[in-house]
Amino acid sequence: MEESQAELNVEPPLSQETFSDLWNLLPENNLLSSELSAPVDDLLPYTDVATWLDECPNEAPQMPEPSAPAAPPPATPAPATSWPLSSFVPSQKTYPGNYGFRLGFLQSGTAKSVTCTYSPSLNKLFCQLAKTCPVQLWVDSPPPPGTRVRAMAIYKKLEHMTEVVRRCPHHERSSDYSDGLAPPQHLIRVEGNLRAEYLDDRNTFRHSVVVPYESPEIDSECTTIHYNFMCNSSCMGGMNRRPILTIITLEDSCGNLLGRNSFEVRVCACPGRDRRTEEENLRKKGQSCPEPPPRSTKRALPTNTSSSPQPKKKPLDGEYFTLQIRGFKRYEMFRELNDALELKDALDGREPGESRAHSSHLKSKKRPSPSCHKKPMLKREGPDSD
């Protein structure tokens, strides 16, 4: 009861009063006090207005135009995203180190159904997008504890080495192959290893993935890491058909190099077909451009030239043949041809030293023959000509 009486004694707020009550609160006279009107009169006195109108009767008063609000500065366009460049190019030279570090790959053919195949002659791995690529790590002796394995991709050609290898914009934005662990711009991923670390170097801007080195199992002699390549080699805005190298390094816990090896990678739709094509091109190139010793070709030329006329030298062992020819013109034609052949053989040295004597003896033996046969042959041709 006491609380209810206290609530009744509280005056209502101002908003609950009537308009008449509010009106009565205003003063009865001098709604606008002189204190407020005085400053208004000082702003523009009457005498000043009259003088101003007398001086400029034909001009209308011009009010000062309100200053236009300052236009906001034009928005600068966002800078185009350019590929980061790195002045540091990692070495790709093979370095087995003290532990005999080297790489190995599973043997696979060139069938169309393969998703990953390695060519030993090209030292090149052909694989499909986001498919498993097992890479074997071989060592002669176990490395120290805390050893890590780093994988990094660089461009193979010299003019592209300073550019950082990354995925194309389309695959970066795509969520089809997102695992939530690897950054979308990284090209190389490790499959089935939650201890993988994806690093972006602040100085070189290059991407790499690092996993702890694990010793081989009891029934195995090597350690296998399954890599994925998350962008095609032909993607525009990414690799753009530029060949790349994957560098695998063995490092200790402080980052010191223990071993290095590398191989070329091509991410394509049909690895078996591309491997077969490139191996055939390499084979044709090797056949068309052999690399023999510098003097071997010079020695081969005279042996070929001397061996080629040997079959023609056998019938010229001093044996002569007689050919009956009808007509003097035909005889002269064959004689000139025979003399030319004899001269050619003499110049080439295909006959023994007495070849000239034999050729002169042959000419003296064959020349009188047409005189004795000329008359009867002319007599035979006489009736035919008539």
Curated annotation (Swiss-Prot):
Name of the protein in its database record: Cellular tumor antigen p53
Subunit structure: Forms homodimers and homotetramers. Binds DNA as a homotetramer. Interacts with AXIN1. Probably part of a complex consisting of TP53, HIPK2 and AXIN1. Interacts with histone acetyltransferases EP300 and methyltransferases HRMT1L2 and CARM1, and recruits them to promoters. Interacts (via C-terminus) with TAF1; when TAF1 is part of the TFIID complex. Interacts with ING4; this interaction may be indirect. Found in a complex with CABLES1 and TP73. Interacts with HIPK1, HIPK2, and TP53INP1. Interacts with WWOX. Interacts with USP7 and SYVN1. Interacts with HSP90AB1.
Oligomerization as annotated region, ranges: 318-349
Species of the source: Bos taurus
Biased composition (Basic residues): 358-377
List of residues that carry N6-acetyllysine: 112, 298, 314, 366, 374-375
Pro residues bias (residue ranges): 63-77
Keyword Cell division listed: no
Residues with PTM Phosphoserine: 15, 20, 33, 37, 175, 262, 308, 385
Region feature Interaction with CCAR2, mapped onto this chain: 1-313
Region (Required for interaction with FBXO42): 105-229
